[in-house]
Amino acid sequence: MARLLVLACSATKRPDHDRIPALARYDGPLWRTLRAADPDGRCAKVAFLSAHYGFRDAATPIADYDARLTQDLAERMIASGVTTRWPRPPSPRRPDTYGIHAGAEIAGLTRYGAKPFQEIALVGGRLYVDVMHALVRGFVEMGCVRREARVSVINWPIGRMRQDLRAWLAAAPARGDQP
């Protein structure tokens, strides 16, 4: 069964000066739980949602940054859907050729819809989960997530989120059971 974990970014980051994969860059409690519970990345494909980078594959190398998801930014991300590039250009006068849009990223994760996700976990605070839900609706329309996909939301106090994330990862089918 094709599974996708979408995890909110983390304020705690490794301070490496070079770009490193988001999976290594983010160092908050949920990211540490992910690395401990699924060190080989076999339980699910992992993506992240960032106030700066938008929706990306967790293997994407990213630079260190400091940005918070505000209500205003969350509303703009929801309104812009899966076709707006993140990060946004540094100036409105610059061409919109910065970053990548969520639709392109999910297409790559699903082999352009050939292997749509059947199970998804959305993990993060309320604003992040709101944006994630909007993106998933767009991914369904693109054919990259099945309409009947099971969507789990993990949004509690941090200790409970860590337990639920670990349990969701542990519930993955055995490697041989996946198509």
Annotate the PLM regions.
Residues M1-P179:
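Peripheral peptide segments
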